[in-house]
Amino acid sequence: MTGAPDSTTPQAASVSTEGARAATLHVPVLLDEVLEALAPRPGGRYLDGTVGLGGHSAAIMERIGPDGELCCLDRDTTALGLARQRLAPWGGRVHFFHTRYADFEAALDQLGWDKVDGALIDIGVSSMQIDMADRGFSFHADGPLDMRMDRDGDEAPASRLVNRATVDVLKDIILRYGEDPMAGRIARAIVDARAAGPIETTAQLAAIVDRAYPAKWRATSRNHPATRTFQALRMAVNDELGQLERFLDRILDRLNPGGRLAVITFHSLEDRIVKHRLRDESQGCVCPRSVSRCECGHKARVDVLTRKPVTATDAELARNSRASSAKLRAAQRLAEGQAPRPRRRNKYAPEGRDEPEGGAA
């Protein structure tokens, strides 16, 4: 993994004609809602921590005018190459870095940017990654059991985890990240199967998980039995929750007053992390409820702009069924000493802790 500008990454510069066409036709999820949340302004500096195929970034560039700039990050060199092509009309005002979004500060520092006016992350696996069998994210087409978003980084492929982890580790991963009630049966089935030879392909793993499920579960389930296992392994391989936590730890310090943060998630675990973090950062107190008087001295740093997560409209779902699980949450950075919106007093909270009008985000 490198924090260098993408021009130093040769893999990103070499993309297929089919990939370039996919980038041109790509319509990003919740596009109108993201633009409303970020409210890009002319001349602003913005961060897209997961540029992907560049759809959100292109829409941002259209709104920030000739003096605006955008910093684009992605850990997938293929995606970066496609994004460079899509965003080429804006030339040097778009800056590309091959890095994890959690490491965004190194990119901003290289650009000499202290703060930005808005930041967006759209986390999880992309449609392009799912559809490329050789990436190993999906069981719909057979391919190597890889699942790495950055194949040039230091992450180990999913095959290593599947073939080396103990039954307890596998069970914990599938239960924690996949929330699969059959986690124990699946973990044991994987360990038993690999005793006969390594598990190297997505089809092999999907078949093992399918057999581990009771017949009545397979008959009544709306999804393939391997769906949650594949999700869990992908999240573990790419440290997806850890990346999100580290990003949220630092991003508010790099937002200008009035700057906006928008986060799109596709999994309840991710959404829960974002929800709770924005809720805490919008409060003047984060002491435990057992404390009768505020002792933490915490000051509200954001206004939460989305009381509930924003989801796709029926019209968008008709165009893109993969948007069905997308959730957008957004917040606006408060200036030092700026009071948040009027807040409702919570009589059960310690003195000094209130809730936003309309309830906690």
Curated annotation (Swiss-Prot):
One of its GO terms (biological process) is rRNA base methylation. Its EC number is 2.1.1.199. Pfam families: Methyltransf_5. Residues 318-361 are annotated as: Disordered. GO terms for molecular function: rRNA (cytosine-N4-)-methyltransferase activity. It is found in: Cytoplasm. S-adenosyl-L-methionine binds at residues 54-56, 74, 101, 122, 129. It comes from the Bacteria. It catalyses: cytidine(1402) in 16S rRNA + S-adenosyl-L-methionine = N(4)-methylcytidine(1402) in 16S rRNA + S-adenosyl-L-homocysteine + H(+). GO terms for cellular component: cytoplasm. Its main location: cytoplasm. This is Ribosomal RNA small subunit methyltransferase H.
